[in-house]
Structures are given as structure tokens and as C-alpha cells.
């Protein structure tokens, strides 16, 4: 008999709607013993089977669902099916957009909770973020080796969220050669260098691909400020769009150095690119106080909120930074502003920008809305998968 997680009465509704998480508060009891990450059956209070998932006793998310099909086992064949299904969509995108790099697996939205896989050329970068994902590591790697024999696999499971599920952080080569210090990839006609081993996340923010492309239509002959620039994807795109100048700001010397190399790699005019190592909040105030003005500002900060208790503080941070940006824009200027915080809804983010405009004493028009690129899909039953949102705003 399999180990069963029994839900409290009335707590099965989210699973009936095929949401992939079971929170600790929904659990009545365990029947049997399961190790960290082991596959268990999830049943309602009367014993009716609901789903099969991975058990995580130390996490607020007590189980993550692998399947809602009672006949489906969690084995090599299961992971093969999931990966092949995901690859079909990425193949179409890669051919349509001329991509050599994309998100192959987007966790819950691809039916593989806690698993992120990014492909950069012939390197697969793996992040296992949940106990169930870690438990299935060997099976997953076996399937990847079979389906992608041409690819080396590199582990970037050096993410703090693993500690919440009782796991250590891991990083390093799994199979094949070590990634080069900087790996060139292609995106919408740009060549970009990616630091797989030491860069943010898996090395690069693939989710902003379409937003970087959209930037080009706003920047011709414009002065652009690129905040939280990282390795300069928005800066390179702005230069390709014909901007007169782009100022990239980041606290990381290493990231700015790669940004400079990316400008040179694309044979763009380096004299139009300025790189400033500074705190964005501080620099925006300095620019405001000395009367600097820009025509376009890209505001792409890191995640400000990790849990609900931080949401109010994050709202203040987003409002302050967008208020400063709005103050720095010329009349008719464009603010391209983003939030990658999953707890920040699009409606709330739009309200924050409206409040920022009021505090800045400017009128703002919302003219375009952004989300993560299409290789980061959002399954309908898991709205939390829509974490990246953004707006193009015209400042009057």
C-alpha cells in the first residue's frame, strides 16, 4: 500500500481545480512514512484519490503534484513524456524567433514542479528547487542525457529556497564539459555573453527576451537610462534600436564589464554607452538633484518581495523608485518598468505606478503591457506562474 497524505475535510477544492500545491494547513494526517521528496498519494478525508505528488515535511507547501492521473507512475517514462511535450513548444519558438537559448522547463507550468531547466546553446542548466525535484534528480538527469546527448548538464541549484525544504545548495558540472567563462548566445539579432557558472539565476534573464526587443521601438535618437542593467541586454537592444546614448547602472562591476563586452561583441558604438557602478536609488536622486533628464528609462529591479510579510515594504520600494524615474523623464518620455515578484499582481503594480506618478506630480499614460517570454508559459490552473509583469508608460 502506498503512503497517503490525507486532506482535512473541505480542503480538496484546489486539487479538484488542478492546482499543483498542497499547503500544510490542508493536511489532516499521513498514513505511512515517506522520506523527503518521496512520491505519495494524496486523498480527500474520505480516502478518495486526488493526485500523486512529492512529499516535503519541512515546507509550508507539504506536497507538490506530479500528476492528476491515477494510472501514471512517476518514473523515467513520466519525465520523458513531460520533457518531450515541453520541447515541442520550445522547438516552435526557437524556429520562429531564431533562438539558440530558451527555458526548456518552467516548473509547475510544464508539469514538473520545482524544476527549472534553461538551455544555452549546447548546455542545459538545471535548478532543482523542491524536495521532490531533488529526489528525482537521477531519473531526470538520465532522461536529459537520453534526449539531449549533444548537451552538457550543469547544476545551478545554489538557490536559498532549497533550505526551506531541508536541502543543501548545490552547484557544478553534472555531465560533459564545463561551461566557458562566458558563453555567447543569440537573441533577436543580438549576441550576448552568458556566465552560466557565476551569473544570476541560471546565468541570464531569458524571461525578458521579448521586453528587450520591444524596447527598440521607443529609443530611436533618444537618451536612455538602463537601471539594474545586469549584463546589458536592454542596453544592447537600445543601441540596436538607434538610441543616442544609453547609461547602464548596476552595483556589480563584473556585470557591467560583461555589458561592455556585449556592446563590443555586437560591433555597436561604444561611445554611446556609459556604464555606472552605483546604487540605483541613490543615483536616481543624484540625477534628479542635478537636473539630469532622459527620454526613456528601463526599470528592471530584482525581486523586492519573497513572502507576504514583505509585500507592504516592497510596494513602498517600487513606488519610490518609479516616482524618481518619472521625475527624470522629459515630457513625452517613456518608462519601461517591471516587477518580477510573484506576489505583486499586475493590478497592484499598475496602482503603484499610478501612485508614483501622483507623487511625482506628473500624468502618466499606460501604453503597453509586458509579461515573461513565451518559453515561460503559465498553466491556467497555476496563476502564480505569471510572476513577471511590466508596463510601458508615457509621461506627460
Swiss-Prot record:
Q: Which reaction does it catalyse?
A: cytidine(1962) in 23S rRNA + S-adenosyl-L-methionine = 5-methylcytidine(1962) in 23S rRNA + S-adenosyl-L-homocysteine + H(+)
Q: Give the species.
A: Escherichia coli O127:H6 (strain E2348/69 / EPEC)
UniProt-listed NCBIfam families: PRK15128.1
What protein name applies here?
Answer: Ribosomal RNA large subunit methyltransferase I
The GO terms this record gives for MF are:
RNA binding; rRNA (cytosine) methyltransferase activity
- GO cellular component term, pick one: cytoplasm
Kindly indicate whether the keyword Methyltransferase belongs to this entry.
yes
Where the record annotates domain PUA, the positions are: 2-81
| Subcellular location, record wording | Cytoplasm
For this protein, the parts annotated as crossing the membrane are: none
What function is annotated for this protein? Specifically methylates the cytosine at position 1962 (m5C1962) of 23S rRNA.
Using the UniProt record, give the first listed, main subcellular location: cytoplasm
Please give the Pfam families that the UniProt record associates with this protein.
Methyltrans_SAM, PUA_3
Q: What is this enzyme's EC?
A: 2.1.1.191
Record keywords: Cytoplasm, Methyltransferase, RNA-binding, rRNA processing, S-adenosyl-L-methionine, Transferase
Q: What are the disulfide bonds?
A: none
* Assigned protein family: Belongs to the methyltransferase superfamily. RlmI family.
Amino acid at each position: 500500500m502506498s503512503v497517503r497524505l490525507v486532506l482535512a475535510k473541505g480542503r480538496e477544492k484546489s486539487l479538484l481545480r488542478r492546482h499543483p500545491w498542497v499547503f500544510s494547513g490542508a493536511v489532516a494526517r499521513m498514513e505511512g512514512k515517506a522520506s523527503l521528496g518521496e512520491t505519495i498519494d494524496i486523498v480527500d478525508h474520505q480516502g478518495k484519490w486526488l493526485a500523486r505528488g512529492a512529499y516535503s515535511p519541512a515546507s509550508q507547501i507539504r506536497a507538490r503534484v506530479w500528476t492528476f492521473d491515477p494510472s501514471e507512475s512517476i518514473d523515467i517514462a513520466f519525465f520523458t513524456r513531460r520533457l518531450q511535450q515541453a520541447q515541442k513548444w520550445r522547438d516552435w519558438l526557437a524556429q520562429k524567433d531564431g533562438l539558440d537559448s530558451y527555458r526548456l522547463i518552467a516548473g509547475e507550468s510544464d508539469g514538473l514542479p520545482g524544476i527549472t531547466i534553461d538551455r544555452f546553446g549546447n548546455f542545459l542548466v538545471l535548478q532543482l528547487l523542491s524536495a521532490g525535484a531533488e529526489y528525482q534528480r537521477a531519473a531526470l538527469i538520465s532522461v536529459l542525457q537520453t534526449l539531449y546527448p549533444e548537451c552538457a548538464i550543469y547544476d545551478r541549484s545554489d538557490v536559498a529556497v532549497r533550505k526551506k525544504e531541508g536541502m543543501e545548495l548545490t552547484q557544478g558540472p553534472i555531465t560533459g564539459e564545463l561551461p566557458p567563462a562566458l558563453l555567447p548566445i543569440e537573441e533577436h539579432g543580438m549576441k550576448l555573453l552568458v556566465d552560466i557558472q557565476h551569473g544570476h539565476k541560471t546565468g541570464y534573464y531569458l524571461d525578458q527576451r521579448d521586453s528587450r526587443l520591444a524596447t527598440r521601438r521607443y529609443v530611436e535618437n533618444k537618451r536612455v537610462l538602463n537601471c539594474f542593467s545586469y549584463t546589458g541586454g536592454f542596453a544592447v537592444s537600445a543601441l540596436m534600436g538607434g538610441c543616442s546614448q544609453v547609461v547602464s547602472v548596476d552595483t556589480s562591476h563584473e556585470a557591467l564589464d560583461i555589458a561592455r563586452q556585449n556592446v563590443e561583441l555586437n560591433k555597436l558604438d561604444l561611445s554611446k554607452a556609459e556604464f555606472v557602478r552605483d546604487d540605483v536609488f541613490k543615483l536616481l536622486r543624484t540625477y534628479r538633484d542635478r537636473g539630469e533628464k532622459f527620454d526613456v528609462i528601463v526599470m528592471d529591479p530584482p525581486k523586492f518581495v519573497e513572502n507576504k510579510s514583505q509585500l507592504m515594504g516592497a510596494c513602498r520600494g517600487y513606488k519610490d523608485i518609479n516616482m524618481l524615474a518619472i521625475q527624470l523623464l522629459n515630457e513625452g518620455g517613456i518608462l519601461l518598468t517591471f516587477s518580477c515578484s510573484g506576489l505583486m499582481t499586475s493590478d497592484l503594480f499598475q496602482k503603484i505606478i499610478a501612485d508614483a506618478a501622483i507623487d511625482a506630480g506628473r500624468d502618466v499614460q499606460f501604453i503597453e503591457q509586458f509579461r515573461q517570454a513565451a518559453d515561460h508559459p503559465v498553466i491556467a490552473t497555476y496563476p502564480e506562474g505569471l510572476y513577471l509583469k511590466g508596463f510601458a508608460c508615457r509621461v506627460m
